């Protein structure tokens, strides 16, 4: 079984793996209970909050994060996983956003990305209506509302490419976005 071999190899090498996190998470029952309660709360209320995990090198922080990723994804939640580094420093939020978006997994998907879900949507579909209403009412800015509406409405491939780039974090000037929105 290839999955079993990958898990054994990850354990042998000490490299954190989502597959390992899926099967070996029972060693921390209190933390797992807290994570489970928090995920249930997010599922029920639609609101999330923060949770700080700290520890020394080799104490299993990444293993725990992989386990949480699997739990949330298994609970039909949108999840994203990224590592902060020199290439993705916390003080450069546009880089964090790009990495976050490129590592976003939709429920039931094994590969990251969300544009494939948008491509089949029209502005009049029920899901699009929910997304647009949320973007218009719940966010601090209306930019995402206009981006989504334009992306779903345009037939022009160049406009679609620019809107896609903006959604993925390669931001387009607001003047150009206004021109596309018409």
Residue ranges of model-derived segments:
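A short, basic N-terminal segment
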Residues: 1-49
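Conserved phosphate/pyrophosphate-binding and hydrolysis machinery centered on Walker-type P-loop NTPases
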Residues: 25-29, 58, 170
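Conserved ATP-binding subdomain of kinase catalytic cores across diverse folds
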Residues: 36, 55, 72-74
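Walker A/P-loop nucleotide-binding motif
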Residues: 45-67
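P-loop NTPase nucleotide-binding core
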Residues: 59, 63-182
């Amino acid at each position: 079984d290839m999955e079993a071999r990958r898990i054994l190899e990850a354990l042998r090498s000490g490299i954190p793996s989502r597959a390992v996190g899926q099967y070996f998470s029972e060693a921390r029952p209190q933390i797992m209970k807290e994570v489970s309660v928090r995920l249930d709360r997010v599922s029920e209320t639609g609101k999330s909050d923060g949770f700080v995990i700290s520890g020394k090198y080799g104490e299993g922080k990444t293993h725990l994060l992989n386990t949480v990723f699997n739990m949330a994804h298994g609970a039909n939640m949108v999840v994203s996983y990224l590592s902060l580094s020199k290439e993705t420093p916390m003080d450069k939020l546009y880089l964090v956003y790009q990495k976050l978006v490129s590592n976003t997994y939709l429920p039931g998907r094994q590969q990251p990305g969300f544009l494939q879900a948008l491509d089949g949507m029209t502005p009049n579909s029920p899901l699009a209506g929910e997304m647009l209403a949320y973007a218009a009412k719940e966010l601090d800015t209306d930019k995402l509302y206009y981006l989504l509406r334009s992306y779903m409405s345009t037939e022009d491939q160049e406009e679609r490419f620019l809107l896609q780039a903006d959604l993925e974090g390669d931001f387009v000037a607001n003047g150009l976005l206004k021109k596309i929105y018409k």
